[in-house]
Curated annotation (Swiss-Prot):
Superkingdom, natural source: Bacteria
Residues annotated for L-glutamine binding in this entry: S47, G238, G240, L267, Q270, N308, G310, F311
InterPro entries noted in UniProt: Anth_synth/Amidotransfase, CarbamoylP_synth_ssu, CarbamoylP_synth_ssu_N, CarbP_synth_ssu_N_sf, Class_I_gatase-like, CPSase_GATase1, GATASE
Pathway given in the UniProt record: Amino-acid biosynthesis; L-arginine biosynthesis; carbamoyl phosphate from bicarbonate: step 1/1; Pyrimidine metabolism; UMP biosynthesis via de novo pathway; (S)-dihydroorotate from bicarbonate: step 1/3
Residue ranges occupied by any Glutamine amidotransferase type-1 domain in the UniProt entry: 190-377
The organism's taxonomic lineage, starting at the top: Bacteria, Pseudomonadati, Pseudomonadota, Betaproteobacteria, Neisseriales
Protein name: Carbamoyl phosphate synthase small chain
Active-site residues, record numbering mapped to chain: C266, H350, E352
Keyword Cell inner membrane found: no
Gene3D superfamilies documented for this protein: 3.40.50.880, Carbamoyl-phosphate synthase small subunit, N-terminal domain (3.50.30.20)
Assigned EC number: 6.3.5.5
Family listed: Belongs to the CarA family.
Subunit structure: Composed of two chains; the small (or glutamine) chain promotes the hydrolysis of glutamine to ammonia, which is used by the large (or ammonia) chain to synthesize carbamoyl phosphate. Tetramer of heterodimers (alpha,beta)4.
Top EC class of this enzyme: ligase
């Protein structure tokens, strides 16, 4: 791994490093993630589509990779930036090194970068376009061409690009030491899950709570969903700008009229908000990490959450029937709402973590409670 690599940002900043992945080039929005672990889950999170991820923890790759920690069918991050790749990896579950994993998944990555300097730059100026090029012939001019071609995340409807193309069933539950992934004996609730870029661990979290899931493509109509006669509807995470997802917004509006319990996270939270007339905005400082403090306004408690989003809901545009339930303690941005006249709730972060804590797993329990109440009514 002696191939030189180049990282260039839209503001003209240039970083020289070493290629540790697939040889080639990658462009996208450069962001930073503060998670100490979970690099494989981050790489395979579809919400990172068209984004180059900087990991702030200095040593990445210590535990290798394995098939069980993948959150989707492939790597979706456009590229990876790290400080140091260890020469050796060690873990009882490891089957492949991070380097080999990146090469096999054709993912461009760069190491030997001053990630502290890069993170401070992104923290001061905000997320911006960037490009990684590998090889001795990589030039700043070529990188600038790639950055210009990428443009911005604003206006990009990426959910339909990462979504499944066919409906499928899911029953597999969460991982247990010594057992692997466990499927519960009883799953009394039928949930239709919209795949806007869904992570497998949120499906497992719901399955472990008694849900049999039918996962549908992002552009599935409300009529087709209701024809499946679900007990509830789940709206997944996903990448890109939520406003161009008009198909999702229209479907949510019709589903809310049906009275079915609905729960959304991440992009799903934003689509619910847009469906009730609120507005979203591009964040200058996006949230990416597994240590974000959020306050539950009902209980007053602080929960530590996993976050991954570059757009947020403008709290000032919420209608009267939307009650704010959670707010970020980093920047006071809106983190959760529920409707006062319908069994609809949503959260901006990731209850399933992967990586990160599961402090807000109780939100999934509340969704289960709404379905139980609806079935008993």
């Amino acid at each position: 791994m002696n191939t030189p690599a180049l990282l260039v940002l839209a503001d003209g900043s240039v970083f020289h490093g070493t290629s540790i992945g697939y040889e080639g080039s990658a462009s996208g929005e450069v962001v930073f993630n503060t998670s100490m672990t979970g690099y494989q889950e981050i790489l395979t999170d579809p919400s990172y589509c068209k984004q180059i991820v900087t990991l702030t923890y200095p040593h990445i790759g210590n535990t290798g990779t394995n098939a069980e920690d993948e959150e989707s069918r492939s790597v979706y991050a456009a590229g990876l930036i790290i400080r140091d790749l260890p020469l050796l990896h060690s873990n009882f579950r490891a089957s492949e090194s991070l380097h080999d994993y990146l090469v096999r998944n054709e993912t461009v990555a760069i190491a030997d970068i001053d990630t502290r300097r890069l993170t401070m730059l992104l923290r001061e100026k905000g997320a911006q376009g960037g490009a990684i090029l590998t090889g001795a012939d990589a030039t700043v001019e070529k990188a600038q061409e790639l950055i210009a071609a990428f443009g911005s995340m604003v206006g990009k409807d990426l959910a339909k690009e990462v979504s499944c193309t066919e409906t499928y069933e899911w029953t597999e539950g969460e991982w247990e030491l010594g057992k692997g992934f466990v499927t519960p004996d009883k799953q009394p609730y039928h949930v239709v899950a919209y795949d806007f870029g869904v992570k497998t661990n949120i499906l497992r979290m719901l399955a472990s709570r008694g849900c049999r899931l039918t996962v549908v493509p992002a552009q599935t109509s409300a009529e087709d969903v209701l024809a499946l006669n679900p007990d509830g509807v789940f709206l997944s995470n996903g990448p890109g700008d939520p406003e161009p997802c008009t198909y999702g917004i229209e479907a949510v509006q019709k589903l809310m009229e049906s009275g079915k319990p609905i729960f959304g996270i991440c992009l799903g939270h934003q689509l619910i908000s847009l469906a009730i007339g609120a507005k979203t905005l591009k964040m200058r400082f996006s949230h990416h990490g597994a240590n974000h403090p959020v306050q539950d306004l009902d209980s007053g408690k602080v929960v530590i959450t996993s976050q991954n989003h570059g757009f947020a809901v403008d709290a000032d545009t919420l209608p009267a029937n939307a009650r704010i339930t959670h707010k970020s303690l980093f920047d006071n941005t809106l983190q959760g709402i529920e409707l006062t006249d319908k069994p609809v709730s949503c959260f901006q972060g990731h209850p399933e973590a992967s990586p990160g804590p599961q402090d807000v797993g109780y939100l999934s329990d509340k969704f289960i409670g709404n379905m139980k109440a609806a079935k008993q009514a």
